[in-house]
Amino acid sequence: MVERRCYDKVNDKVLLISGMQWGDEGKGKLVTHLSKDFDLVARYNGGHNSGHEMYLDGVKYKLHSLPCGVLVPNTLNVLGNGVVVHLESLLSEIDGLLKLGIDLTNRLFISERAHLVLDLHIAIDSQLESEQGEYSTTIGTTKRGIGPTNSTKCKRTGIQLGELLNWDNFEKLLTKLTYKLNHENKVFSNSDLADLLNKELEIYKTNFSKIAHCVCDTSYMIQKYIKEGKKVFFEGANGALLDLALGTYPYVTSSNTTTSGVYNGLGISPSVKILKVGVLKAYQTRIGQGPFPTELFDDNYVKLQKHGSEVGVTTGRTRRCGWLDLVSAKYVQGFSGFDVINLTKLDVLSQFDEVKLCTNYKHKVTGTTLKNLLPPFRYLHNTIYREFLEEGRYPNCCYQFDEYEPVYKTMPGWKTDISDFKTFEQLPQNAQNYVLFIEEYLGVFIHWVCLFINNITFRWELAKMLIK
């Protein structure tokens, strides 16, 4: 029996929401919905490469760099030190919200330790993604310069936002980094590079004053809020399977997208008590290249893509779609430790006579499922290794995805429009069974069921109700 751990509006002071797949799980809907109960919403990773699409009071909003809490009046919003900032894009996003009547004056704070995304970073990213031939390193990024920015960060040559508070020093740092990056990547001629540098210096000189008042020690700010017992919300970008260390490497993003990334990304102590919420879409999607064991290429793909409106907010690319992969979800749960789950877009599956869930992988040749903990072993270059992965294990290397295929559990569909249903108990029994099977497989209580069209069904321990 799965423990029914529920979100307590009174006692759960610190909340974290993070994606359990390759991003695009629908995190923004729950963040926006719950943010009204919180004093501060902080984002701990990513940059303007991610995208959130939300509806609030009938108006559609598209966010990239900013936390979803910006849509909630009086809520403070933080971009932590784990976020990378492209100044022009951020200002454009702020101006766009202002035109829609949302003023972020005195509501947005940005870490002085956040690294800057330069236009040259974006040019390098675009160059890498356009490479052709045998030695191409293309992985399907958004071409927003996030990878090159984090690369310079790791090389200790990047520039933090706080450096702009001392213009003379910033000018030296930007000049040095620009010529160094171009020397390494050979993107521009010397004359074009000089023009780019002058243009970028002018942009920063003109625009930084617009957000200078927002730049501060956000780590101290968040720590202070937590100590004072205020309600703080942590928002992650992307999804756990895109994590640099634990995702489907190298087809990953360049930051830590897992729950553990919140500590470094915001500068808070691991001792802080956090209710961790995992967001899981009722089926699987992915943008860009990389392994996707349950990917569909038939009419079922067309149905999922069309009815789920699976188009990337940032790039406009059509998302790849497939059945829900519970093996990957269990893998993510193992290192994330989510207390509760928010299941999204359940209504998109209403069109199917039957639905499938991947519960295991089997070898394409031998047909053996991934559950062998004992021999047979085999040798490779005098090294012994297991021929089969044990049950519940997710492959570590991309080549392993080519050797295995999904094992599905088929469940009857519900063929009923559930978009207007207001309680979990109103859902067709087959839909309820689908939710309960996921819950039992993962061993985590599904506290919210989000419908793509309208509602969020909220499951209490004894009663099930809808939050409007």
Swiss-Prot record:
The keyword Lipid metabolism does not apply. Mg(2+) binds at D24, G51. GTP binds at G23, D24, E25, G26, K27, G28, K29, G51, H52, E53, R319, K345, L346, D347. IMP binds at D24, E25, G26, K27, N49, S50, G51, H52, T142, R156, N238, T253, R317. Transmembrane segments: none annotated. Its EC number is 6.3.4.4. Its cofactor is Mg(2+). Pathway: Purine metabolism; AMP biosynthesis via de novo pathway; AMP from IMP: step 1/2. Binds 1 Mg(2+) ion per subunit. Keywords: Cytoplasm, GTP-binding, Ligase, Magnesium, Metal-binding, Nucleotide-binding, Purine biosynthesis. One of its GO terms (cellular component) is cytoplasm. One of its GO terms (molecular function) is adenylosuccinate synthase activity. Its main location: cytoplasm. Substrate binds at V313, T314, T315, G316, R317, T318, R319. Plays an important role in the salvage pathway for purine nucleotide biosynthesis. Catalyzes the first committed step in the biosynthesis of AMP from IMP. Belongs to the adenylosuccinate synthetase family. Parasitic protozoa lack the de novo purine biosynthesis pathway and rely exclusively on the salvage pathway for their purine nucleotide requirements. HAMAP family: Adenylosucc_synth (MF_00011). Homodimer. NCBIfam families: PRK01117.1, purA. This is Adenylosuccinate synthetase. It comes from Theileria annulata.
